[in-house]
Amino acid sequence: YLSARRRELYVPGADYPFRNENKRITGKIHMLQYLSDAPKGVVVISHGFTESAAKYDEVAYYFLKEGYHVYIPEHCGHGRSYRLTADPFLVHIDTWRRYVRDFLKACRYIKKAHPDLPMDLFAHSMGGAIGGIAAVWEPDWFHKVILSSPMIRPLTGNVPWPAATGIALEKCILGKDEEYVAGKKPYDGGGSFETSSATSKPRYERYKNLRAEHKELQTWSPSYGWLWASAEMSWYLRLYGWKKYTAPMLLIQAQTEDLVSVRALKNFAGKINRQGKTT
């Protein structure tokens, strides 16, 4: 069913006006397209940290059965999209704006392909931060917005958030932004369902096996550049972004959150409900 409706696409990433010519890196965004037989709308999925479009086959299936075309662009440094580092296991970004601009470039392509259909956003974890900011920058593009465990603020383990962001900033200033965050390591094929944040063992095992077979899916750990970018996205959303939403929004919190701050998510939702322009 899925393979009959699936198509691989590549769209150019967004141009970003860096002052430093060495940072004017652009590439192609890889995207999976699933076309419904009787579409009533389009859903764009913004995936999470270290994930890929391949992880969302089941989600795409459910949206297809409900009558939606589905598009899943892969963020820079993930899957088959372009990367800023030669290390295949490292998730690295030079500026959070690159994520958002690339995502909106993909959305612009999708809107042109289906001008008469409403476009909805389903965004998870890191993709929730990226998609959440995209909906701030282009509020008229998205008919409805679903943020699933959005990374309003990432959790940083035993290191307090202020200390973690301070260390990340220092590393970036010293030109060490492509270093692995302390305690993180390259992909080694390890990991287990019991120590993961997954709740379905068959789903966990499926993607673990898929990742082992495909090098492009083996992104595993963050760089200090990524950590600093996540901090900047967090501040943007919490201090400014929440004021700008106009589309109806559904925020989803997991029963147990291991990777994102529940407190930050609840505060974000509270601000929107009390003073925002949407529900």
List the predicted regions and their residue ranges.
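N-terminal cap/lid segment of alpha/beta-hydrolase-fold proteins
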Residues: Y1-L35
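Conserved alpha/beta-hydrolase
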Residues: A53, A60-A86
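Alpha/beta-hydrolase active-site loop
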Residues: V91-K111
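Alpha/beta-hydrolase-fold enzymes
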Residues: M126, I130-Q218
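Catalytic histidine neighborhood in serine/cysteine hydrolases
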Residues: G270-T279
